[in-house]
């Protein structure tokens, strides 16, 4: 059974080190492709270094929601959702421990983040271009790659957008 807890309730069960460790495992499984430059590898490592601070900051920010998933009491993943402006809503971080890939942890976190952002509002996310599994997952939740959007990242990313009321497969 998946248990979802948000903000302070989640932080009562996990530490900053737990967030960092889970992010390290999640990125190791999904962020790396064979041809990354040293700068790209370092950019991916930075994600791990800033994960706990970012999550703790989200818990203290009324425009963000940190939601953690637990399976049988074990920390399995998290999502950070951010409202930048009324129609600028971002599914900011979605990290799932590789041990729980293929379970509904990612789906439960995705639904929680999207519901908090408002299914009747447009939303977006960014995804590493070579992470085809994640792209397919986001497409199942109504997101489509915006090929006109440009994002300046060391590791190439796509912006994916979801129109209000888009169907979930």
Predicted region positions:
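Generic C-terminal helix-cap and adjacent flexible tail
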Residues: 163-169
